[in-house]
Curated annotation (Swiss-Prot):
Name of this chain's protein: Zinc finger and SCAN domain-containing protein 12
Principal subcellular localisation of the protein: nucleus
Start and end residues of each stretch annotated as Disordered: 155-175, 201-264
Protein family per UniProt: Belongs to the krueppel C2H2-type zinc-finger protein family.
Length: 604
């Protein structure tokens, strides 16, 4: 790119405004007219129109005239109908009202109508809500932002959209995964090379970019090869292979055959002899032009035989077919989990390495996946449009609402492949799987038990007696936050876990699960000594004390020991003593003390 955009407006009061765009040296009037029709140049004029300052002019008349000319260059009433101009204005306002974290990303897709924006956002919402190959509490392993014509593997490249760089620099999209290029190149051969070249050309600056970007990307932009930032600043042979293959003199790219070398050298100098008749964009290879023209014609020749969905490029179709085949060729060396996409594996590996590339601009919290950041941002905006009809709780995502509804229905769709245990939430499954995935490597020095890192911290509170979670109503303290949440339902009266069979509600999910076994007759906990079976693990533990003779609950007054910590029913006390009210009250008070402490307090 010769230089950055510069606009100069010189006007006398009696002369028409003259706007000069200095980007390239156009040799003919036809070149300039063709360039004027480019969508990106219209975007430049729109930016100057919106950001025009009154102080830049000598007076109000000049300011008005310059605004008129900039608006004319943007909307172009000589070529656009009223409906098209109206659509441009609606599109601009639509992009303006989008959440800030979405604006820059949507504008990178270069939508030309409001309908295109809607399609992009609906596709994004569907991908965010899909369970996919999930490995974290927030999202799954998904390529949410890889649409058909979005570049793959441009790691380290800054966004070249004028809007994202100038108007909203702090919402630039984080880099995508560069490894995808290598994988897809192997799978699809030269087809991906063609697509990669076009993507590189489409990512050339069209707006008010800085010379810094041009210097950093001068090599990679010429030939479409991708380099990491450190590779660009170091030796140009960083991408060449160790086995002395022919390399390009321009950038050190390895080439396997002489034909590849000839073709590659024609691309590197920037020769672009194939021009698009619709928008004027030029390409170095005819195949790139053909694929680009499908944007204008709407042609999608590559059709999936399974679902009928069509695509503009063969590479995108190949990537799509993995959904139907269920193939998962990319395997994690740490835990053995397999994925259908390289990017999914790459994101998953961040769980092991601890890398978190995506940061929240509001609170600084970091995430390993882009979807996790998007969901987190909604917390700050308090955007919770999805409401549960059972308990009226609201959620920021439809997928979270669906998971929450499992609390009421008892559905547990997330099952562990190792032990078969099922969970309502995917995050609970992920935490559980740490047990199987060699995460249980932190040992308690007090008792020798092993836990995950977070599990060890909670466990050690048993030995230290620390109870950091305190109830504000009764000041009772707990070791875990979940225990505090369950306790607080005593004060609020909330019983979110309801039985579908009899309608009875409970404060804890585990109690509901145990209750439902009354209806199903299931008794999964069996005593090894006598064969008796029980609905709950607590009942089994209490029963086993009959065989072991264990009595862990001891009275502080007399030393008498008990197997259970049982309290007498309030209703039972009042019914038995209805003729002697004072006796009933005394017994009711004594029932507030556990059985193993009330044996010596007969004076109540």
């Amino acid at each position: 790119m010769a230089s950055t955009w510069a606009i100069q407006a010189h006007m006398d009061q009696d002369e028409p405004l003259e706007v000069k765009i200095e980007e390239e040296k156009y040799t003919t009037r036809q070149d300039w007219d063709l360039r004027k029709n480019n969508t990106h140049s219209r975007e430049v004029f729109r930016q100057y129109f919106r950001q025009f300052c009154y102080q830049e002019t000598s007076g109000p008349r000049e300011a008005l005239s310059r605004l008129r000319e900039l608006c004319h260059q943007w909307l172009r009433p000589e070529t656009h109908t009223k409906e098209q101009i109206l659509e441009l204005l609606v599109l601009e306002q639509f992009l303006t009202i989008l959440p800030e974290e979405l604006q820059a990303w949507v504008q990178e897709q270069h939508p030309e109508s409001g309908e295109e924006v809607v399609t992009v956002l609906e596709d994004l919402e569907r991908e965010l809500d899909e369970p996919g190959e999930q490995v974290s509490a927030h999202t799954g392993e998904q390529e949410m932002f890889l649409q058909e014509m979005v570049p793959l593997g441009k790691e380290g490249e800054p966004s070249m959209s004028l809007q994202s760089m100038k108007a909203q620099p702090k919402y630039e999209s984080p880099e995508l995964e560069s490894q995808q290029e290598q994988v897809l190149d192997v799978e699809t051969g030269n087809e991906y090379g063609n697509l990669k070249q076009e993507v590189s050309e489409e990512m050339e600056p069209h707006g008010n970019t800085s010379s810094k970007f041009e210097n950093d990307m001068s090599k990679s932009a010429r030939c479409g090869e991708t380099h990491k930032p450190e590779e660009i600043t170091e030796e140009p042979s960083a991408c060449s292979r160790e086995d002395k293959q022919p390399t390009c003199d321009e950038n050190g790219v390895s080439l396997t055959e002489n034909s590849d070398h000839t073709e590659h050298q024609r691309i590197c100098p920037g020769e672009k002899s194939y021009g698009c008749d619709d928008c004027g964009k030029a390409f170095s290879q005819h195949s790139h032009l053909i694929e680009h023209q499908r944007i204008h014609t709407g042609d999608r020749p590559y059709k999936c035989e399974e679902c009928g969905k069509a695509f503009r490029g063969r590479t995108v179709l190949i990537r799509h077919k993995i959904i139907h085949t269920g193939e998962k060729p990319y395997k994690c060396n740490e835990c053995g989990k397999a994925f259908g996409r390289w990017s999914a594996l790459n994101q998953h590996q961040r769980l092991h390495t601890g890398e978190k590339h995506y940061h929240c601009n509001d609170c600084g919290k970091a995430f390993s996946q882009k979807a996790g950041l998007f969901h987190h941002i909604k917390i700050h905006k308090r955007d919770k449009p999805y409401q549960c009809t059972q308990c009226n709780k609201s959620f920021s995502r439809r997928s979270i609402l669906t998971q929450h509804q499992g609390v009421h229905t008892g559905a547990k769709p997330y099952e562990c492949n190792e032990c078969g245990k099922a969970f309502v939430y995917n995050s609970s499954l992920v935490s559980h799987q740490e047990i199987h995935h060699k995460e249980k490597c932190y040992q308690c020095k007090e008792c020798g038990k092993s836990f995950s890192q977070s599990g060890l911290i909670q466990h050690q509170r048993i030995h230290t007696g620390e109870k950091p979670y305190k109830c504000e109503v009764c000041e009772k303290a707990f070791i875990q936050r979940t225990s505090l949440t369950e306790h607080q339902r005593i004060h609020t009266g909330e019983r979110p876990y309801k039985c579908d069979k009899c309608g009875k509600a409970f404060t804890q999910r585990s109690v509901l699960t145990e209750h439902q076994r009354i209806h199903t007759g299931e008794r999964p906990y069996k005593c090894d000594e006598c064969g008796n079976a029980f609905r709950g693990i607590t009942s089994l533990i209490q029963h086993q004390r009959i065989h072991t003779g264990e009595k862990p609950y001891q009275c502080d007054e007399c030393g008498k020991a008990f197997r259970q910590r049982r309290k007498t029913s309030y209703k039972e006390i009042l019914l038995k003593n209805h003729s002697e009210p004072q006796a009933g009250v005394n017994l009711l008070l004594s029932s507030l003390i556990p059985e193993w402490q009330s044996c010596c307090r007969k004076d109540l």
